């Protein structure tokens, strides 16, 4: 599903964010991406969804080489990917419903399809009763769940989560992780970046560890 072959990423000024990263995720797999702040986790996720481009190496997504995508091709890639950030990037002047509907509106979905799929996504994250609320009226955990609903409303093949529990307490973090597991059980490929080892150590999913741009590990853990 996702394959990196000797991928490096350097920024202006010479800072090397990733160096020779190679790994492969199978369709329907769930894995954790760990490492200290600045290790390259966010850069790796941005490379998968085309926000960044590699300096060297190849990236494959669903059998397609996305290393040198043309700008006009990037939207087709991103429609297959749900991206979740620590800062959920919600529009504070729009309702919860409107925030979740944005990807469908951009994709040109019909009004009936938007209503059906937004309601289903909000129901999945337990926020159907908050559809008319504004994000400012929600708790931090609820805001993050709105971000998750927006990420899955397009029924993506892949979910990428960048420190989605970074601002949440242990109980809320556990709830967010269970949501990702539910999506994974129905076939969604999930890659979650986190530095919260205590949260993920109770799971047996594969762990990919970045350190100063180099990838280590990649085997399952107990």
From Swiss-Prot:
Give the observed phenotype of the deletion mutant. Inactivation results in a filamented cellular morphology, but not in a temperature-sensitive phenotype.
Which consequence is recorded for altering residue 41 to R? Does not bind ATP
* TM ranges: none
Gene Ontology biological process terms, A to Z: cell division; division septum assembly; FtsZ-dependent cytokinesis; peptidoglycan turnover; positive regulation of cell division; response to antibiotic; transmembrane transport
Cell cycle listed as a keyword: yes
Q: Name one GO cellular component term.
A: cytoplasm
- Cellular localization per UniProt: Cell inner membrane
Indicate what this protein is called per its UniProt record.
Cell division ATP-binding protein FtsE
Q: Which organism is it from?
A: Escherichia coli (strain K12)
- Which gene is transcribed and translated to give this protein? ftsE
